[in-house]
Regions:
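Proline-aspartate-enriched helix->loop->beta-strand connector
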Residues: 75-78, 82-88, 106, 214, ...
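Basic- and aromatic-lined ligand-binding clefts that recognize polyanionic substrates
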Residues: 18-33, 136-197
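Ligand-binding pocket segment of bilobal, Venus flytrap-like solute-binding proteins
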Residues: 169, 175, 202-231
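Short helix-initiation/N-cap motifs at beta->coil->alpha
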Residues: 7, 67-75, 201-211
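Structured C-terminal subdomain patch of bacterial secreted/periplasmic proteins
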Residues: 217-289
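Extracytoplasmic low-complexity, Pro/Thr/Ser/Ala/Gly-rich segments
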Residues: 1-31, 44, 281-289
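Extracytoplasmic substrate-binding proteins
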Residues: 9, 96-170, 266-289
Protein backbone atom coordinates (compact mmCIF):
# COMPACT_ATOMS: atom_id res chain seq x y z
CA UNK A 1 0.00 0.00 0.00
CA UNK A 2 1.03 3.61 -0.55
CA UNK A 3 0.28 6.22 2.11
CA UNK A 4 0.33 9.95 1.24
CA UNK A 5 1.39 12.26 4.07
CA UNK A 6 2.93 15.61 4.97
CA UNK A 7 6.44 14.60 3.89
CA UNK A 8 5.57 12.67 0.72
CA UNK A 9 4.66 9.02 0.33
CA UNK A 10 5.41 5.81 2.18
CA UNK A 11 5.23 2.44 0.45
CA UNK A 12 4.52 -0.58 2.66
CA UNK A 13 5.17 -3.74 0.67
CA UNK A 14 3.60 -6.37 2.92
CA UNK A 15 1.64 -6.63 6.18
CA UNK A 16 4.05 -5.54 8.94
CA UNK A 17 4.97 -7.80 11.85
CA UNK A 18 7.03 -5.49 14.07
CA UNK A 19 5.13 -2.22 14.43
CA UNK A 20 6.23 0.66 16.67
CA UNK A 21 3.49 3.03 17.83
CA UNK A 22 5.48 6.26 18.14
CA UNK A 23 2.72 8.77 19.00
CA UNK A 24 0.25 9.30 21.81
CA UNK A 25 -2.82 7.36 20.63
CA UNK A 26 -1.92 5.10 17.70
CA UNK A 27 -1.78 1.98 19.87
CA UNK A 28 -5.59 1.97 20.00
CA UNK A 29 -5.91 2.00 16.22
CA UNK A 30 -3.39 -0.82 15.83
CA UNK A 31 -4.94 -2.98 18.56
CA UNK A 32 -8.43 -2.36 17.16
CA UNK A 33 -7.52 -4.29 14.00
CA UNK A 34 -5.55 -6.99 15.81
CA UNK A 35 -2.04 -5.62 15.36
CA UNK A 36 -0.10 -5.80 18.64
CA UNK A 37 2.72 -3.24 18.54
CA UNK A 38 6.20 -4.13 19.80
CA UNK A 39 6.42 -0.66 21.39
CA UNK A 40 3.88 1.97 22.40
CA UNK A 41 4.23 5.57 23.56
CA UNK A 42 2.96 6.78 26.92
CA UNK A 43 0.61 9.77 26.95
CA UNK A 44 -1.05 10.13 30.37
CA UNK A 45 -2.85 8.10 33.00
CA UNK A 46 -0.07 5.70 34.09
CA UNK A 47 -1.65 2.66 32.44
CA UNK A 48 0.13 -0.72 32.15
CA UNK A 49 2.12 -0.71 28.90
CA UNK A 50 0.50 2.68 28.13
CA UNK A 51 -2.66 0.82 27.12
CA UNK A 52 -5.96 1.82 28.74
CA UNK A 53 -8.54 -0.68 30.03
CA UNK A 54 -10.75 -0.54 26.92
CA UNK A 55 -7.81 -1.87 24.86
CA UNK A 56 -5.98 -4.08 27.39
CA UNK A 57 -7.62 -7.34 26.31
CA UNK A 58 -6.37 -6.77 22.75
CA UNK A 59 -2.77 -6.98 24.01
CA UNK A 60 -3.38 -10.67 24.67
CA UNK A 61 -0.68 -10.78 27.32
CA UNK A 62 1.94 -9.02 25.18
CA UNK A 63 4.28 -6.64 26.99
CA UNK A 64 5.31 -3.93 24.53
CA UNK A 65 8.22 -1.62 25.26
CA UNK A 66 6.96 1.75 26.54
CA UNK A 67 8.45 4.83 24.89
CA UNK A 68 7.85 8.49 25.75
CA UNK A 69 8.05 11.81 23.92
CA UNK A 70 9.45 13.81 26.84
CA UNK A 71 12.60 14.61 24.84
CA UNK A 72 11.09 14.19 21.40
CA UNK A 73 10.76 10.95 19.45
CA UNK A 74 13.36 8.45 20.77
CA UNK A 75 14.87 7.63 17.37
CA UNK A 76 17.80 5.53 18.65
CA UNK A 77 15.58 3.46 20.92
CA UNK A 78 13.18 2.83 18.02
CA UNK A 79 16.10 1.80 15.77
CA UNK A 80 17.17 -0.75 18.38
CA UNK A 81 13.72 -2.40 18.23
CA UNK A 82 14.22 -3.24 14.52
CA UNK A 83 10.64 -2.41 13.45
CA UNK A 84 9.24 -3.05 9.98
CA UNK A 85 6.73 -0.17 10.33
CA UNK A 86 6.73 3.02 12.43
CA UNK A 87 3.34 4.62 13.00
CA UNK A 88 3.74 8.27 14.04
CA UNK A 89 0.56 10.10 13.05
CA UNK A 90 0.19 11.70 16.50
CA UNK A 91 3.83 12.35 17.37
CA UNK A 92 4.65 15.84 16.11
CA UNK A 93 7.08 14.56 13.47
CA UNK A 94 9.23 17.18 11.72
CA UNK A 95 11.05 16.74 8.41
CA UNK A 96 14.39 15.91 10.03
CA UNK A 97 12.90 13.28 12.35
CA UNK A 98 10.91 11.83 9.45
CA UNK A 99 14.16 11.29 7.51
CA UNK A 100 15.76 9.56 10.51
CA UNK A 101 12.75 7.33 11.14
CA UNK A 102 12.24 6.38 7.51
CA UNK A 103 15.88 5.28 7.36
CA UNK A 104 14.96 2.70 10.03
CA UNK A 105 11.66 1.46 8.55
CA UNK A 106 8.69 2.69 6.49
CA UNK A 107 7.17 5.50 8.56
CA UNK A 108 3.64 6.93 8.59
CA UNK A 109 3.67 10.49 10.02
CA UNK A 110 0.80 12.99 10.22
CA UNK A 111 -1.28 13.46 7.06
CA UNK A 112 -1.11 17.26 6.96
CA UNK A 113 -0.52 20.29 9.16
CA UNK A 114 -1.89 18.80 12.39
CA UNK A 115 1.34 17.81 14.14
CA UNK A 116 -0.75 16.16 16.85
CA UNK A 117 -4.36 14.98 17.01
CA UNK A 118 -5.60 15.00 13.47
CA UNK A 119 -9.29 13.98 13.28
CA UNK A 120 -9.69 10.51 14.78
CA UNK A 121 -11.30 8.97 11.71
CA UNK A 122 -8.47 10.14 9.45
CA UNK A 123 -5.81 8.75 11.78
CA UNK A 124 -7.66 5.44 12.18
CA UNK A 125 -8.22 5.05 8.42
CA UNK A 126 -4.56 5.72 7.58
CA UNK A 127 -3.34 3.26 10.21
CA UNK A 128 -5.85 0.66 9.01
CA UNK A 129 -4.47 0.97 5.48
CA UNK A 130 -0.86 0.87 6.67
CA UNK A 131 -1.39 -2.52 8.31
CA UNK A 132 -3.50 -3.92 5.43
CA UNK A 133 -6.75 -3.78 7.43
CA UNK A 134 -8.57 -0.91 5.70
CA UNK A 135 -11.93 -2.71 5.45
CA UNK A 136 -11.93 -3.87 9.06
CA UNK A 137 -11.08 -0.34 10.22
CA UNK A 138 -13.84 1.18 8.12
CA UNK A 139 -16.40 -1.13 9.70
CA UNK A 140 -15.12 -0.23 13.20
CA UNK A 141 -15.41 3.51 12.45
CA UNK A 142 -18.91 3.02 11.02
CA UNK A 143 -19.82 1.01 14.12
CA UNK A 144 -18.83 3.90 16.40
CA UNK A 145 -20.96 6.32 14.35
CA UNK A 146 -23.92 3.95 14.55
CA UNK A 147 -23.63 3.61 18.34
CA UNK A 148 -23.78 7.35 18.95
CA UNK A 149 -26.51 7.89 16.35
CA UNK A 150 -28.57 5.14 18.01
CA UNK A 151 -28.28 6.95 21.36
CA UNK A 152 -29.67 10.09 19.71
CA UNK A 153 -32.62 8.12 18.33
CA UNK A 154 -33.33 6.68 21.79
CA UNK A 155 -33.37 10.21 23.24
CA UNK A 156 -35.22 12.41 20.73
CA UNK A 157 -35.69 15.18 23.32
CA UNK A 158 -31.92 15.76 23.32
CA UNK A 159 -32.05 17.17 19.79
CA UNK A 160 -30.83 20.77 19.79
CA UNK A 161 -29.93 20.79 23.48
CA UNK A 162 -26.79 22.83 24.15
CA UNK A 163 -23.74 21.08 25.57
CA UNK A 164 -20.19 22.05 26.44
CA UNK A 165 -17.27 19.62 26.65
CA UNK A 166 -14.95 21.03 29.30
CA UNK A 167 -11.44 20.24 30.48
CA UNK A 168 -11.50 18.57 33.88
CA UNK A 169 -9.20 21.05 35.58
CA UNK A 170 -8.80 24.81 35.55
CA UNK A 171 -6.12 26.07 33.15
CA UNK A 172 -4.27 29.24 34.17
CA UNK A 173 -7.06 29.91 36.63
CA UNK A 174 -10.01 29.60 34.29
CA UNK A 175 -12.16 27.04 32.48
CA UNK A 176 -11.49 25.61 29.02
CA UNK A 177 -14.02 24.13 26.59
CA UNK A 178 -13.67 22.18 23.34
CA UNK A 179 -14.68 24.15 20.25
CA UNK A 180 -17.20 22.60 17.88
CA UNK A 181 -15.21 20.26 15.65
CA UNK A 182 -14.24 16.62 15.28
CA UNK A 183 -13.71 16.25 19.05
CA UNK A 184 -17.37 17.10 19.66
CA UNK A 185 -18.85 15.13 16.74
CA UNK A 186 -19.93 12.33 19.08
CA UNK A 187 -22.12 14.80 20.96
CA UNK A 188 -23.67 16.01 17.69
CA UNK A 189 -24.41 12.41 16.72
CA UNK A 190 -26.45 12.10 19.92
CA UNK A 191 -28.44 15.21 18.92
CA UNK A 192 -26.61 17.79 21.03
CA UNK A 193 -25.11 21.05 19.77
CA UNK A 194 -22.13 22.93 21.17
CA UNK A 195 -23.25 26.19 22.79
CA UNK A 196 -22.31 29.25 20.68
CA UNK A 197 -21.33 31.16 23.81
CA UNK A 198 -17.73 29.90 23.57
CA UNK A 199 -17.16 30.98 19.95
CA UNK A 200 -15.67 34.42 20.72
CA UNK A 201 -13.04 32.83 22.96
CA UNK A 202 -11.89 30.02 20.68
CA UNK A 203 -8.53 29.49 19.05
CA UNK A 204 -8.05 26.20 17.24
CA UNK A 205 -9.64 23.33 19.10
CA UNK A 206 -10.29 25.05 22.41
CA UNK A 207 -11.87 28.07 24.02
CA UNK A 208 -10.29 29.63 27.10
CA UNK A 209 -13.12 31.42 28.85
CA UNK A 210 -12.22 34.82 30.36
CA UNK A 211 -12.78 34.83 34.09
CA UNK A 212 -15.53 37.47 33.90
CA UNK A 213 -17.48 35.35 31.37
CA UNK A 214 -17.29 31.97 33.11
CA UNK A 215 -20.68 32.13 34.78
CA UNK A 216 -22.49 33.34 31.66
CA UNK A 217 -20.88 30.65 29.49
CA UNK A 218 -21.69 27.85 31.94
CA UNK A 219 -25.27 29.06 32.22
CA UNK A 220 -25.68 29.07 28.42
CA UNK A 221 -25.54 25.26 28.24
CA UNK A 222 -28.17 22.65 29.09
CA UNK A 223 -25.46 20.22 30.13
CA UNK A 224 -21.76 20.60 30.97
CA UNK A 225 -19.47 17.59 30.55
CA UNK A 226 -16.29 18.01 32.60
CA UNK A 227 -13.54 15.51 31.74
CA UNK A 228 -12.44 15.07 35.34
CA UNK A 229 -10.05 12.29 36.30
CA UNK A 230 -10.75 12.09 40.04
CA UNK A 231 -13.16 13.15 42.79
CA UNK A 232 -10.52 15.75 43.73
CA UNK A 233 -10.84 17.31 40.27
CA UNK A 234 -14.59 17.55 40.78
CA UNK A 235 -14.16 19.14 44.22
CA UNK A 236 -11.70 21.70 42.86
CA UNK A 237 -14.10 22.76 40.10
CA UNK A 238 -17.06 23.05 42.45
CA UNK A 239 -14.90 25.08 44.83
CA UNK A 240 -14.30 27.67 42.12
CA UNK A 241 -16.50 30.68 42.99
CA UNK A 242 -17.85 31.22 39.46
CA UNK A 243 -18.59 27.53 38.93
CA UNK A 244 -20.13 27.29 42.39
CA UNK A 245 -22.21 30.44 41.86
CA UNK A 246 -23.59 29.46 38.46
CA UNK A 247 -27.13 28.41 37.63
CA UNK A 248 -25.52 25.31 36.13
CA UNK A 249 -24.48 24.28 39.63
CA UNK A 250 -27.74 25.36 41.27
CA UNK A 251 -29.70 23.30 38.72
CA UNK A 252 -27.21 20.40 38.75
CA UNK A 253 -26.35 20.48 35.04
CA UNK A 254 -22.84 19.05 35.49
CA UNK A 255 -21.57 15.65 34.36
CA UNK A 256 -18.20 14.76 35.89
CA UNK A 257 -16.40 11.91 34.14
CA UNK A 258 -14.37 9.13 35.71
CA UNK A 259 -10.68 8.86 34.87
CA UNK A 260 -11.43 6.10 32.37
CA UNK A 261 -14.20 8.09 30.69
CA UNK A 262 -11.94 11.16 30.47
CA UNK A 263 -9.23 9.00 28.92
CA UNK A 264 -11.68 7.50 26.44
CA UNK A 265 -12.86 10.93 25.28
CA UNK A 266 -9.25 12.11 25.00
CA UNK A 267 -8.14 9.05 23.00
CA UNK A 268 -11.12 9.35 20.61
CA UNK A 269 -10.47 5.95 19.08
CA UNK A 270 -12.41 3.01 17.63
CA UNK A 271 -11.76 1.19 20.92
CA UNK A 272 -12.35 4.07 23.36
CA UNK A 273 -15.50 5.59 21.90
CA UNK A 274 -17.69 2.51 22.55
CA UNK A 275 -16.98 2.99 26.26
CA UNK A 276 -18.18 6.61 25.95
CA UNK A 277 -21.29 5.47 24.07
CA UNK A 278 -22.08 2.99 26.87
CA UNK A 279 -21.33 5.10 29.93
CA UNK A 280 -22.00 8.75 29.10
CA UNK A 281 -25.67 8.59 27.96
CA UNK A 282 -27.06 7.44 31.36
CA UNK A 283 -25.26 10.39 32.98
CA UNK A 284 -26.64 12.79 30.36
CA UNK A 285 -30.13 11.33 30.79
CA UNK A 286 -30.14 12.29 34.48
CA UNK A 287 -29.91 15.93 33.38
CA UNK A 288 -31.58 16.02 29.96
CA UNK A 289 -34.25 13.37 30.57
Amino acid sequence: VTIDHLFGQTVIKEPPKRVVSAGYTEQDDLLAVGVVPIAVTNWFGDQPFAVWPWAQAKLGGAQPVVLNLDNGIPVDQIAGLKPDLIVATNAGVDADTYQKLSAIAPTVPQSDGDAFFEPWKEQAAVIGRAVFQADQMKSLIDGVDQRFTAVGKEHPTWTGKKALLMEGALWQGTVVAAMAGWRTDFLNQMGLVIADSIKPFGTGHRAVIPRDRVKAVLDSADVLIWTTESPDDQKALLADPDVAGSQATAQNRHVFTTKEQAGAIAFSSPLSYPLVADQLPPQLAKILG
